[in-house]
Design a protein with these regions (language model features):
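Polytopic alpha-helical membrane-helix bundles and their juxtamembrane interface segments
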Residues: 1-178
C-alpha cells in the first residue's frame, strides 16, 4: 500500500512543479491524473471496486457538470480530451474513497473521503479560475483545499493502517480518536 501512496504523492509533487511553469499545464495535468490513479488503486486495497454505487453516480455526475461548465465557459478545444480524462479519474477516485468510507465506517476512512472531495473542490476552483473567469483570492482557496485534501487523504490512510494493524474493530476506532 505504501508504494501506491508514495506514487500518488510523487505524481502530485511532479504536478505541483510542472504547474509552476507556463506551457506545462498538460504535463502537470497528466502528473495529477497518474497521482489519482495511484490513489484509486490504493483505496481499492482490501475492497471491491466502487462499493457505493450512489457515490459513484454522484461523483461522476458532479464531474460531468463541472466539465460541462468548463466546456461552455471557455475550455480550449485542445484541452477538452485531457481534461475529460482527468475529471473522470478524479471522480472515480472520490467515488472509491466515499465507497470505502461507507463500508469501513470509521474516522480514518471518512477523513480520506473528505480529502478526496476536497481534491475535487480544489481542482474545480483552479479550473474555474483558469478557464472561466479569474476571481479574487483564487490561489489561496485552491491551495487551501488542495493541501487539506492531501493531509486528509494521507493522514486518514496512515491512521487507518495503524488502527488495522492494532486489531481494533471497525467503528470502535472512531471513539478512541475523538
Amino acid at each position: 500500500g505504501r508504494l501506491w501512496l508514495l506514487a500518488a504523492l510523487a505524481g502530485s509533487l511532479a504536478g505541483d512543479v510542472l504547474l509552476l511553469f507556463p506551457g506545462y499545464f498538460v504535463p502537470g495535468l497528466v502528473s495529477f491524473l497518474l497521482a489519482h490513479i495511484a490513489y484509486l488503486v490504493l483505496l481499492r486495497q482490501g475492497m471491491g471496486w466502487f462499493p457505493s454505487r450512489g457515490a459513484l453516480a454522484v461523483t461522476l455526475g458532479v464531474g460531468a457538470a463541472m466539465y460541462a461548465f468548463l466546456w461552455t465557459g471557455g475550455l480550449p478545444a485542445g484541452l477538452r480530451a485531457p481534461v475529460a480524462a482527468y475529471v473522470t479519474v478524479i471522480a472515480l477516485m472520490a467515488a472509491q474513497a466515499i465507497g470505502r468510507a461507507t463500508v469501513q465506517r470509521d474516522a480514518a476512512s471518512r477523513a480520506v473521503a473528505v480529502g478526496a472531495c476536497c481534491f475535487m473542490l480544489s481542482d474545480t476552483l483552479l479550473a474555474t479560475n483558469k478557464f472561466v473567469a479569474p476571481w479574487p483570492l483564487a490561489s489561496f482557496w485552491v491551495l487551501t483545499s488542495y493541501y487539506a485534501a492531501q493531509v486528509l487523504i494521507v493522514g486518514g490512510w496512515l491512521r487507518g493502517q495503524t488502527v488495522a494493524q492494532a486489531g481494533v474493530r471497525p467503528g470502535a476506532e472512531s471513539l478512541r480518536f475523538q
